[in-house]
Amino acid sequence: MIQPRHAILRGEPGNVALEVLLVPFYWKNEWVDTAIRLDGINLPSAHLADLAGKTFLFPLNPDAEAIDGSIYLDSAHHPCDVSVIEFMRSRNDGLKVLIKGVYVFEFEGLDQFGNTPFILSTTVSSCAV
C-alpha cells in the first residue's frame, strides 16, 4: 500500500529534513496523497554529493538523537521510527535513498496494523545550494 514516489532533502548540517512523497493510494473509500516527513536528521550535509555511497544509523525513539518522523493517515500523524538511511548511486547518475524503519500505527489507534517494519527506496533530490 505505501510506496515511495520521490524524496526531497533540505536543511543544514546536523538538522536535515527528508520528505518522502508517496504514490497516492486508496484508503477507506477515498484517495490519499500523503508523505513521510523525517525531521531533525543528524546528517553532515544536505548536498547529495557529500552523502553518496554513505550509510547512517540512528537510534529509535525515545532516544534524544532519534529522527522525528511521521506519516499523516486517517486524520492522524503516525510516528515513523527510522534506524537506517543509505544514499546509493543510481544507474542514471542520480542518487537513491534507502530508508529502514517502523511505522508505529498503534500510537494513534490503527491497532489492526500494529507496528509495521518497512524498507523504502526511491530517487532523492536536494534543495541545498
Label every PLM stretch briefly:
Residues 1-76:
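An ectodomain-focused feature that recognizes extracytoplasmic/extracellular
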Residues 57-125:
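Acidic, glycine-rich flexible loop segments
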